[in-house]
Amino acid sequence: LFALGVRDRVFSILLWYIWACLFGRNPLISNPGLPYVGLLLFVHTFLPSAPYGSFDRRKEPDPNNGWRLPQELFVVVWILMAVGYTYSGYTKLISPSWVDGDAFAYVLNSPLARPSFARDILLWMPTSIIHLLTWGALAAEILFLPLSLFSRSRPMIWFNMLMMHLGLIMLINFADLSLGMVMLHLFTFNPAWVKRKESPQVDRVFYDGYCGLCHHAVRFLLAEDARDNANIAFRFAPLQSDLFVAAIPQDERAKLPDSMVVLTGDGETLLRSSAWLRILDRLGGVWRVLSIALRLVPRVVLDWGYDLVASVRGRLFKKQEDACPILPKELRARFDY
C-alpha cells in the first residue's frame, strides 16, 4: 500500500517503526544502509501528500497539483549522507586491510562473494590494481563531504559512490549491504544535473483522444512538464482534431499509428519509440537518463515493444468519452483543436 501511494505518509511511520524494531536483527554484520532507509521513511512523513502516480492522486483533475520535494528535506538528507560517507571513510583509516589496500581482495575471497565472471576477472587482476580499487573507494568516502560542497563535483562523487554500490550488489551475495544506499542515492538525485534537450519551439504531441492509455500518458507529461507556459516543452492535440489534419498531410496521416505522434518544432514527425525517446529527452532529469539507456537497445526491439503495448491497450485501459482529459483550466490551455 505504501508503494502504491495509499495513505503513504501514515504507512511510512508504521514502516519506520517496524524498521527501527528490526534494526539490530543481525549483530554480526554492520549494515550502514539500514539507518538511511529508516531516515528516508521518516522524511517521507513530511512530504506533501498524493504525488503524481500515487493511488490517492488518481482521480484528481490536476495530475501534479504543484507537488514538489521540499528543498529543506532534500538538503538535510544530502548533509546526512555526505557526513555519513566521510565519517565512514575516516573510521576505515584505523583498519589495516583498508590502509594496506587488501580490503577489496578480502571481499572477493569471502564466503559472501557471488560467483560470477566479473569476480573472476577482478581476482585475475594484479594485486596493485586491487589495491588501487580499495584506496579509490576509501578516498571517495573520505572526500565525499568536501566534494559535495561544490556544485560541479557534487554529481561526480554522487555517481562514483552509486556505481560502487551497484558493483557491490553484483559481486556480493548479500544485496542488503548496498541496496539501502542505492535507495538513498536515488532520493538525492538532482534532476537539474541532466538538462533537458532544448528546442527553440514547442513540440506537439498528438494522441488518440479515446485511448485510456494515451490519456494517462498525457497526464504524465503534464505532471513532469510542469513549467510556466512560457517555458513548456509540449502542447497537446487529439489525433481527431482539426489541427492534426492541418499539420500532417493526408498521404502521411494514412501511414501513422493511431496512438501517439510527436511533431517537433522543426517539423519532423516522430513515431513509436522515436517519439518517446524525444519526449524523454525533452523532459530532462532522470527521464533523459532513461532515454540514453534505451538507446542502447536496438530500435527494432523498442518499436516491437511499443506496438505490443499498443495492440493490447484497449483491453487494459478504459475507453475515454472525452478526447481531452479532465483537467483544470490552466492545463486545458495547453491543448489545441
Where are these regions (language model features)?
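Short, positively charged
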Residues: 63-66, 119-122, 235-243
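Solvent-exposed, well-ordered loop and adjacent helix/strand elements within mature globular domains
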Residues: 92-133
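Extended, low-polarity transmembrane helix blocks
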Residues: 1-97, 127-204
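Short, acidic, Ser/Thr-enriched surface-loop or helix-capping motifs
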Residues: 86, 208, 264-265
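Conserved helix-turn-beta segment immediately C-terminal to the redox Cys motif
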Residues: 222-236
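Local sequence-structure signature of Cys/Sec-based thiol-disulfide redox active-site neighborhoods
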Residues: 198-224
